UniProtKB/Swiss-Prot annotation:
Pfam family, one: DUF1627
Note: Encoded in the Rac prophage.
SUPFAM superfamilies: Winged helix' DNA-binding domain (SSF46785)
Domain of life of the native organism: Bacteria
Organism: Escherichia coli (strain K12)
Name the record gives this protein: Protein YdaW
Signal peptide (UniProt feature, chain positions): none
């Protein structure tokens, strides 16, 4: 009967599923044997593919980054808007990538979590040097050119559900050439 090692040597490289099909045994048995061979230094693993090792020298410890195939699903940490907002308050303006690194999650998850805070006015997103940074309104924002003419001001108030803070935002419309300034309708 052909062994897992012999089959892998004949195939060059293969997945555990391919080896199980060739040997007509369960995938679990193949995986157990492959991990034993890996610990002994006879096979190597990259992603989901196994191959015979170049050198048959015993490795002292397998790499910690490599996990069995059943455990390779990524888990994304749960984060809340309050946690992200508190970090921005402490550390200043941050990009989604920087926040994702701090919280061990994806930048897409960070951006999605902060979208509601932006729409409610609890945070603003500012383009600085080609990167969008999330900021607390009124804190160390980049200098913006002032409008030449005086325009009316409107106040918008919103309360932060996380910290019990009332944030007042001053809205100044930029004047256009052919339009009169109107009050926004709520």
């Amino acid at each position: 009967m052909e062994t897992v090692f012999d089959a892998l040597k004949a195939m060059g490289k293969a997945t555990s599923i391919e080896l199980a099909a060739r040997l007509d045994i369960s995938r679990e048995e193949v995986l157990n044997e492959l991990w034993e061979l890996k610990k002994a230094g006879f096979v190597d693993k990259s992603a989901y593919t196994w191959r015979v090792a170049d050198n048959n020298v015993q490795q002292e410890q397998p790499a910690q980054a490599e996990l069995p195939e059943e455990i390779t699903t990524a888990t994304v940490a749960k984060i809340s808007e309050c946690d992200l907002t508190a970090t921005i308050e402490q550390r200043g303006p941050q990009t989604a990538d920087e926040l994702a690194t701090l919280f061990g999650t994806t930048s897409r998850k960070v951006a999605s979590t902060l979208a509601m805070a932006i729409s409610k006015g609890r945070l603003i997103r500012v383009n600085q040097g080609g990167k969008f940074r999330y900021c607390i309104p009124g804190d160390n924002l980049p200098a913006e050119p002032k409008a030449a003419s005086v325009s009316p001001l409107w106040l918008s108030a919103s309360s932060s559900a996380c910290h019990g803070v009332l944030i007042i935002t001053v809205i100044t419309p930029s004047p256009t050439k052919n339009s009169a300034t109107k009050m926004p309708e709520n």
